[in-house]
Regions:
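Structural signal for interior beta-strand "rungs" in well-ordered beta-sheet cores
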Residues: 4-184, 188-189
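Terminal amphipathic alpha-helical/low-complexity segments used for targeting or macromolecular assembly
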Residues: 1-8, 13-14, 19-20, 56, ...
Length: 260
């Protein structure tokens, strides 16, 4: 289908725009930009150099994609923001491109970023993530597939959040949040296994029980976290989910969030 592009939009002729794209008045699109098929760009959106957008994305009013990183190390190098397919950016979202030459900020497929969310430079976001109103993710973070952030969450630089974890509203955290759990509070603490989401994903009951047993060893045991990992390997039946937990904890550089 033909594109529907307002003559009041400001679009650099070098920008690569796919098929069946709708661009509303007063959108601003720079030249080093790729926009896939079936995207909708609302009024007053800025799509800036280095942005590579997949198919079927929706970008609402006043959002800025590919903004220069808010990082004193940035020297004007050519960097990118990579956006997957069917991503929704609601009003006033800001996503920065990477800092150093050749670097990328990445947003996976089918993510949903609510009003006022901000994803900073060099952060990597997996698919199917949700970012609530006003949530701010600092630079160099790693967000796993299906992670859910409630409103007004602040993730400090370089933290990791595991697959299908949920961060409760108003939480600020500076340590890693392992997969499949709920975390919240001040200071942030473990709040149990995210059974609601695991049920939604149709994870078997025995797998959910194994996940709960693994985290019982980590958060309720009397040993160090890394001794708890050894106990998980010895006591909890193996599965991809258990391996995900083990590998995540072994890979932490900042440490994981507090015990109860």
């Amino acid at each position: 289908m033909a594109n529907q592009i307002s003559d009041k939009a400001v679009i650099d002729p070098k920008a690569q725009i796919g098929d069946n794209v709708t661009i509303y008045p007063f959108a601003y699109i720079e030249g080093d930009v790729v926009i896939g098929d079936n995207c909708v760009i609302a009024p007053n959106v800025n799509v800036l150099n280095g942005t590579r957008m997949g198919n079927g994305c929706k970008v609402f009013q006043n959002t800025v994609l590919g903004a220069m990183p808010q990082d004193f190390h940035f020297k004007g190098d050519k960097t990118e923001l990579i956006i997957g397919n069917k991503v929704t950016f609601r009003e006033n979202v800001v996503v920065n491109r990477a800092t150093f030459a050749g670097g990328q900020t990445v947003i996976g497929d089918k993510c949903f970023l609510m009003e006022g969310a901000h994803i900073s430079h060099d952060t990597k976001v997996g698919s199917h993530c949700v970012f609530g109103y006003g949530t701010k993710i600092a630079g160099d973070c790693e967000i796993g597939r299906g992670a859910v952030f409630s409103s007004n969450v602040i993730a400090n630089p370089k933290v990791r959040v595991g697959d299908n974890a949920m961060i409760l509203a108003g939480t600020t955290f500076s340590k890693d949040v392992p997969p499949y759990i709920i975390a919240g509070g001040a200071p942030v603490k473990y709040g149990g296994v995210n059974t609601l989401l695991l049920d939604y994903l149709r994870k078997e009951k025995k797998i959910q029980d194994h996940i709960a047993n693994a985290y019982r060893l980590v958060f309720h045991g009397q040993t160090s976290v890394f001794d708890a990992v050894l106990q998980i390997q010895q006591q909890v039946p193996d599965s991809p989910e258990i391996q995900n937990i083990i590998n995540f904890i072994k890979g932490t550089k900042l440490g994981i969030i507090c015990k109860l």
